[in-house]
């Protein structure tokens, strides 16, 4: 395992595996919940974050969470689009703009990230406290609060794609 995390390719494979596992386990956890719409998305998003938090703690590296900001919203937006009554063209306009943002950030992360030995210096600083404060900073400051910020930021896409009376024409965009 140590040799795997020393290379960029091995580290990327592990992070990808962790994301697939977290998304799938979050799906399994939430699939039988009797929640609708945004609340279901929120519970799924938080569940996936907590699973990534566990993987981050296994590696003692919170930078595993870094691409979560822009990778986790991708299945969320496609899930929302699947619920949409907008035309394919209107959905494509919204999804294209979103994907441009998400893929651009993911590509930039990919270019600049070295491997699982690299942890953002800000995370290290936030965790350079006593163990309890470090845990609180890691769980809330590095993982959960950013997830909630991203979740709130996705709400306009949710409203756009799920509103029945929304007139999404090129003039409005």
Regions found by a protein language model. Give the residues of each.
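Short, hydrophobic transmembrane alpha-helix segments
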Residues: 24-38, 55-61, 84
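Loop-to-helix transition at the N-terminal end of transmembrane alpha-helices
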Residues: 33-48, 63-74
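N-terminal membrane topogenic signal
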Residues: 1-17
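Central hydrophobic cores of alpha-helical transmembrane segments in multi-pass inner-membrane proteins
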Residues: 22-23, 44-56, 72-79
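Hydrophobic core of alpha-helical transmembrane segments in multi-pass integral membrane proteins
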Residues: 12-29, 48-51, 150-156
């Amino acid at each position: 395992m140590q040799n795997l995390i020393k290379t960029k390719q091995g580290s990327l494979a592990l992070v990808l595996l962790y994301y697939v596992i977290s998304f799938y386990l979050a799906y399994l956890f939430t699939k039988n919940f009797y929640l609708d719409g945004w609340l279901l998305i929120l519970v799924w998003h938080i569940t996936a974050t907590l699973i990534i938090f566990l993987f981050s703690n296994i590696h003692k590296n919170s930078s595993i969470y870094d691409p979560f900001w822009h990778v986790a919203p991708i299945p969320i937006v496609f899930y929302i689009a699947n619920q949409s009554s907008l035309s394919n063209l209107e959905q494509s306009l919204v999804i294209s703009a979103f994907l441009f943002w998400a893929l651009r950030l993911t590509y930039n992360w990919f270019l600049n990230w070295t491997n699982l030995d690299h942890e953002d210096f800000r995370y290290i600083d936030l965790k350079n406290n006593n163990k309890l404060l470090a845990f609180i900073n890691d769980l809330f400051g590095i993982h959960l609060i950013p997830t909630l910020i991203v979740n709130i930021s996705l709400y306009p896409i949710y409203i756009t794609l799920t509103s029945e009376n929304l007139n999404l024409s090129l003039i409005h965009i």
